[in-house]
């Protein structure tokens, strides 16, 4: 319950005006409901001759009479006058019209209370999705190394929907039902405290039985949602690896794997659904037991000579008692739904509560560009729950220099350059820009002066224009076209069906690898960064595409400080300095010719590529 109240505090309070409106209309609905039921007693007593008492009007300000007695007496008095003047049949019709009017107002109030809750429910779901999405964008890259993308998607879709259906869906019950219970219970006590005392003794037994069924629902729901995440992750991997699956004729294997995930989810979801489905029949049965017990006890009282209530009042009491059963059933339903939804809240909170080690200091300094040098000072780095990847790397890069980093796969090249824009933070040593530790700089400013061109060109399912202008505010068409021309991309863009307004497809699937890379370079050119990071930007291209991309890169690198990672040594021969990284350490450094003369690691790498 504490977790549930915390969810309400976080997401419901911004919509308190809707809560207030719902409370008002629910209260009105409950009062009208009770008021219409109260007309049953005089109908039975007066119309069917059960009550023979002659009533006389009592002035409203009569001393010594309680308000209750005055109201009851005068109501019977006016009812008697109607019967005498218009007859029993007409009076019955009048009371029936009164009931119809009261019911119309009651149902109208109920509809208004439900309609008012709709904007709150949809707003809460929107708020959760936005909050999760914003959190995802703020998390470091290391988070996504530990989490499967399909699982994250499942939390944003399935779990958030479950929160809407279970938690916010139960919220309406939790607003309406307490009002109904208070009104109905007050009427029950007012009508017969003896019968109500008996009812109160029986109710806890029912509550215990209902609670026992729902106790394990949260754990079962959490397990089922985890299985659903595995299914979504499997689907995401299948869509992303479709080419490999077909190349290795692995359709059968993937089908079996997906079938297994789906069956596991089915079994888990079945257990949850069966337990949840037991809510209504169990509450129905227990409610009937309660009615029978009260009917027996009330009948016993009436048959006794000293009964505190008469038969019509007892019938009214039973009507109210039966009416109180439905709110209790709704509470029982909520007791199953809420734990199920809280399991989804727990999974969503795993994202929202994820720690972000990449933080910005309160007094972080702005940075407008690189004026002097970048310095890696005895840098050490280790991934979480892993061994150290970089061991005491020291490197100075002067403004305008091009530094190449080469080495075997797994030597730490990409990790080293990922430390500069603070995708990760060093675990030892420091990295400075113009003498200032990058951890003391504003993160947005730091990343704003760095441009990236990676081995895998990441494009969005958007137009050429928007992909090139990505991250650059108020970019004009002239600026985008100029960047595309420098990147050797303008020609094939103009050959597309709608030019710069052509959509490139999911992850740029409508383009070749070389075209995607040139669009990526155009994006970096438009950003106009002081520092450029090239991470094996031409390693996956054919000879012709590599030539065009290399030309674009050379234009991009002019007047910029560049850190280039390369497997093909031919692309970095003209670098001002080449650093050879081996097992997390710089083992050699110098120009291309100097390193060949050393006859060391670099020479061996070069000789292997000459074969």
Show the residue positions of the predicted features:
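An intracellular "coupling" helix at the cytosolic face of ABC transporter transmembrane type-1 domains
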Residues: 13-17, 141-142, 158-167, 171, ...
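Transmembrane helices of ABC transporter permease
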Residues: 21-28, 172-223, 296-309, 326
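Juxtamembrane helix-loop junctions of ABC transporter transmembrane domains
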Residues: 33-41, 93-94, 98-149, 153, ...
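Short intracellular "coupling" helices and adjacent cytoplasmic loop segments at the cytosolic face
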Residues: 48-52, 122, 130-154, 158-160, ...
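Helix-loop-helix
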Residues: 187-201, 275, 279-346, 351-352
């Amino acid at each position: 319950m504490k977790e549930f109240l915390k969810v309400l505090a976080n997401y419901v309070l911004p919509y308190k005006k809707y809560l207030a409106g719902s409370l008002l209309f629910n209260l009105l609905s409950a009062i009208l409901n009770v008021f219409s039921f109260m007309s049953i007693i005089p109908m039975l007593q007066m119309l069917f001759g059960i009550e023979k008492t002659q009533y006389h009007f009592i002035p409203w300000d009569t001393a010594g009479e309680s308000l209750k007695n005055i109201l009851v007496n005068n109501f019977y008095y006016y009812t008697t006058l109607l019967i005498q003047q218009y007859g029993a049949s007409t009076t019955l019709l009048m009371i029936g019209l009164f009931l119809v009017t009261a019911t119309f107002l009651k149902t109208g109030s109920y509809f208004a209370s439900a309609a008012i809750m709709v904007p709150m429910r949809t707003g809460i779901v929107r708020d959760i999705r936005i909050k999760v999405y914003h959190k995802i964008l703020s998390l470091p890259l290391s988070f996504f190394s530990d989490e499967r993308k399909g699982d994250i998607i499942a939390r944003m879709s399935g779990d958030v929907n479950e929160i809407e259906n279970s938690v916010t869906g139960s919220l309406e019950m939790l607003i309406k039902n307490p009002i109904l219970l208070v009104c109905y219970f007050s009427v029950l006590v007012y009508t017969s405290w003896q019968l109500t005392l008996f009812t109160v003794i029986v109710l806890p037994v029912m509550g215990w039985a209902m609670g026992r069924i729902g106790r394990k629902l949260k754990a079962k729901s959490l397990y089922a949602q985890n299985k659903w995440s595995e299914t979504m992750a499997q689907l995401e991997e299948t869509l992303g690896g479709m080419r490999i699956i077909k190349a290795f004729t692995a359709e059968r294997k993937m089908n079996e794997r997906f079938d297994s995930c789906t069956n596991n989810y089915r079994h888990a979801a079945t257990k949850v659904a069966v337990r949840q489905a037991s809510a209504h029949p169990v509450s129905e049965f227990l409610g009937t037991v309660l009615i029978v017990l009260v009917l027996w006890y009330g009948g016993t009282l009436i048959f006794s000579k000293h009964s505190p209530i008469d038969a019509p009042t007892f019938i009214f009491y039973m009507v109210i008692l039966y009416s109180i059963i439905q709110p209790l059933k709704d509470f029982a339903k909520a007791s199953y739904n809420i734990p199920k939804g809280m399991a989804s809240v727990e999974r969503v909170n795993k994202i929202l509560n994820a720690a972000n080690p990449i933080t910005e200091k309160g007094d972080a300094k702005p940075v407008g560009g690189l004026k002097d040098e970048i310095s890696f000072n005895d840098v050490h780095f280790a991934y979480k729950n892993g061994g150290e990847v970089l061991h005491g790397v020291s490197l100075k890069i002067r403004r305008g220099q091009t530094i190449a980093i080469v080495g075997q796969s797994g030597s730490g090249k990409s990790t080293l350059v990922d430390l500069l824009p603070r995708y990760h933070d060093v675990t030892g040593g420091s990295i400075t820009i113009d003498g200032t530790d990058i951890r003391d700089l504003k993160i947005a400013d730091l990343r704003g002066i760095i441009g990236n061109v990676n081995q895998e060109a990441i494009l969005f399912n958007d137009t050429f224009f928007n992909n090139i202008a990505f991250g650059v505010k108020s970019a004009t068409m002239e600026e985008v076209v100029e960047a595309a021309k420098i990147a050797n991309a303008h020609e094939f863009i103009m050959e597309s069906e709608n030019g710069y307004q052509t959509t490139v497809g999911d992850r740029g699937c409508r383009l070749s690898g070389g075209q995607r890379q040139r669009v990526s370079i155009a994006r970096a050119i438009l950003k106009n960064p002081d520092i450029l990071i090239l991470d094996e930007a031409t390693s996956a291209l054919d000879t012709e595409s590599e030539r065009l991309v290399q030309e674009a890169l050379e234009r991009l690198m002019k007047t910029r400080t560049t850190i280039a990672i390369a497997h093909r040594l031919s692309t970095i021969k003209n670098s001002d300095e080449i650093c050879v990284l081996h097992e997390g350490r710089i083992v050699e450094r110098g120009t291309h010719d100097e390193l060949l003369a050393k006859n060391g690691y670099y020479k061996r790498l070069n000789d292997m590529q000459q074969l």
